[in-house]
Amino acid sequence: MQIVADVGGIPGKDCRGYCKYCYFRKVKPIEPLGCRYCPPNSVGCARCSEGICETGTEFKPSFLVMNEIQTSMMMNQGLNGEFKVNISGGGDVSCYPQLEELVSGINQFGLKSHLGYTSGKGIDDSEMASRLMNLGVDEVTFTLFADDIGLRKEWVKDPTPEASLESAKLFAENANLYAASVIIPGVNDGEVLRKTCESLESWGAKALLLMRFANTTEQGLILGNAPVVDGIESQSIEEFSSLVDEINKEYSLRVTGTPLGDPTINAPFIISKEGNEEYLQFLKEVTGEATIVTSKIAAPFISAVFKKIGANTVNVIGTNKDIACLMTREDFESIDLSNVKDSVIIPGRSFVHDKVVEDIFSRDGVERVVGRGPDTLSVDGELSSGMTDEEVIMEEIESFRDLIDAINFFGMRKV
C-alpha cells in the first residue's frame, strides 16, 4: 500500500522556475471554476480555486510530513501488504530542502520511498542520487524531456543538466526509474526521442511515459494561459497515439502515452476493445435512461461498451475537450440539448458547480436531472505503466459498474 507524503510546494517557485512547456506557466488569475465540493449555493472552494493552480501550500517542514505519514500508518494498520511512501508535492521534490532528512526518517520506519515527481532540477551533484538510494529510495518518476544537455537547459530550465542526467542514469541502474517526456514537435521528437530511448534502454529504465504537449484550451489549459508556447502546434490525438505505438515497438522498455495510450496492454478502455467482450458479462444491467457527457477521447470507447451490452437507452456525447476531468462550464454550454435525454451523467471530477450545470442542461425549458459519474473509467498511461492488463481491467469493470449505478439511479424510468 502506498502512503502519500505531500511535501507541498508551489509550481514555478519551488522547482527552480517553470519549465518552458509547463502548463502552470503564464497562468492568469481566474474566478473559481466550480466543482462537486463547492457549497450548494456558491461557486468556489479550495479545490477549484487555489487547489487547481496549486498555489496554496509552501514546502512543509519535514517533521510535519513525518507526522502525517505516521498518522496514515496508524489509520491503515489492519490492511494487508507492505507500506511504501510516495513523496510528492506541488513543486519538484528534488528541490525540497529537507528531502534527505525526510527520506532518512522514512527509512527509520523500515519503509521504502518513491520520489513521485522530479525533473532533477534540484540535484546539483549526482552524489545526492546515491545518498537517496542508500536511504531507501527504490523508485523514481523522472521527467527527463531529452538526454540532451542543451535541450534540458533551454526547455527544462535546468541549471545543472549534467548532474540531473547522471542522476537519472544512477536511478535507472540501481532502482526503478519511470521516465517521462513532454513531446514538443520539432524539439524532442524524431531522432532526439530515439536517442533518449536508447539511453534509457541502456541504463535499465523500467518505462517511458510520452506526454502530449498541451497548448490549447481544448487540450486541457483551463487556467487562461493558452498558448504556453507560441508557434507550437501539438500532434493530433491520432498522430500522438501512433507515435506511442511506434516507439513502444522499437524499444524494450515499456512505452505509454497520455492522453493515449498503453499499447502493451491495449489500454485505456481495454474492455471496450474487440475480442474483450467476455469482460462485459460482469457489468450490471442498465435499467435507466440517460445521456453520458464526456471528453472527445473517451466518448467512442464509452459508447462502444454500452452498444455491446445492448443499452439502447443510453447515448454518449463527446465535447471538444480532450480530457474529461478538465471539462468546464463552457464545454457543457456548447452541447446541443436536442440530443440530451431527461437525465444526464457528467464526469465526476469535471470543473463545474452542480447547480450551474443543472441550469445549463435546463436552459431549453426541459428540467433535467444531472448526476456525476465515477472520477475515472479507465487508467491513464501515467499509471498503467506499472500495472498489468488484469489490474486495469478490474479497475474498468469496477468503474463501469459505478457508472451504471449512476445511470440506473438518476435515469430511473417512469412507470
What would you call each of these model-derived segments?
Residues 1-48, 345, 350, 358-366, ...:
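Flexible, acidic/Gly-rich N-terminal and inter-domain linker regions that tether
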Residues 2-4, 82-86, 112-114, 139-141, ...:
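Structural preference for beta-strand elements that scaffold enzyme active sites
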Residues 4, 10, 26-102, 106-124, ...:
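Core AdoMet radical
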Residues 10, 90-92, 118-122, 145-147, ...:
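Active-site beta-loop-alpha junctions enriched in small/polar residues
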Residues 149, 167-192, 214-215:
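Conserved strand-turn element in the central/C-terminal portion of the radical SAM core barrel
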Residues 201-415:
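Auxiliary Fe-S-binding modules of radical SAM enzymes
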